[in-house]
């Protein structure tokens, strides 16, 4: 399915400081890996930001109908965490600008591109035009249910979505069979530390 979702969980806190949990979740004995809260889980959240575009390189005439692209923050550790496979170019790192993007094959095909590196798609808002330049392409991965059509998706540096990151999640992996134990430990942290916040805690395999 193009991405890792087995033994993968994620937790977010609204009205609570998730940053305080980074080290605590990573230190849980059943957790094998945890990423800092700079990202959103592919499942079930997906993109928290969408843009409408109607123009991209090699388009013969500007399309009447606009395409919706989901924009997700991501850096090397995110691509590695989910096992997303790079087909060409590079993944997003700190040397990239906020408008550098990695897209998947499906988005590349929708633009009619055989080769996407260095090409751009354009977003217009209030008469201002922004260009997003493709620096990498990853293999398709299915993050929606098998019956629904895959969305168009682009990954960009988290600095481009800073205003959303107070809602970001800690993504983590846990030992085989340890989900219930893991969930209980995180629920206890929640009750002890942020009882008035709203917690979202998911096992990505169960949500798919």
Model-derived regions: residue spans:
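Beta-strand-rich non-transmembrane domains
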Residues: 64-70, 89-102, 121-140, 162-164
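The feature marks short, hydrophobic/small-residue-biased sequence motifs that occur predominantly
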Residues: 50-88, 135-136
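Short, well-structured beta-strand/strand-turn elements
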Residues: 32-35, 85-90
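Short, solvent-exposed hinge/capping segments at secondary-structure junctions
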Residues: 74-88, 102-119
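Activation segment
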Residues: 82-83, 96, 111-112, 125, ...
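"Rare, low-scoring activations can occur
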Residues: 16-36, 105-106, 128-208
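A short, compositionally biased
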Residues: 45-48, 113-119, 165
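Membrane-proximal extracellular/periplasmic loop immediately following the first transmembrane helix
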Residues: 1-60, 65
């Amino acid at each position: 399915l193009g991405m890792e979702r087995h033994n993968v969980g994620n937790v977010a806190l609204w009205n609570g400081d998730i940053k305080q949990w980074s080290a605590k979740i990573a230190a849980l004995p059943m957790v094998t890996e945890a990423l800092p809260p700079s990202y959103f889980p592919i499942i079930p959240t997906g993109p928290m930001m969408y843009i409408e575009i109607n123009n991209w390189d090699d388009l013969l005439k500007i399309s009447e109908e606009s395409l919706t692209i989901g924009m997700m923050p991501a850096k090397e550790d995110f691509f590695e965490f989910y096992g997303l496979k790079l087909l060409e170019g590079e993944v997003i790192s700190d040397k990239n600008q906020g408008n550098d993007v990695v897209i998947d094959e499906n988005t590349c095909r929708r633009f009619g591109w055989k080769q996407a590196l260095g090409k751009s798609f354009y977003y217009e808002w209030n008469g201002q035009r922004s260009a997003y330049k493709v620096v990498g392409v990853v293999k398709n991965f299915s993050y929606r249910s098998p019956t629904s059509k895959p969305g168009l998706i682009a990954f960009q540096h988290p600095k481009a979505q800073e205003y959303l990151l107070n809602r970001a999640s800690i993504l983590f992996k846990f030992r085989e069979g340890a989900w219930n134990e893991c969930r209980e430990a995180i629920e206890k942290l929640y009750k002890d530390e942020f009882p008035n916040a709203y917690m979202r805690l998911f096992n990505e395999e169960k949500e798919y």
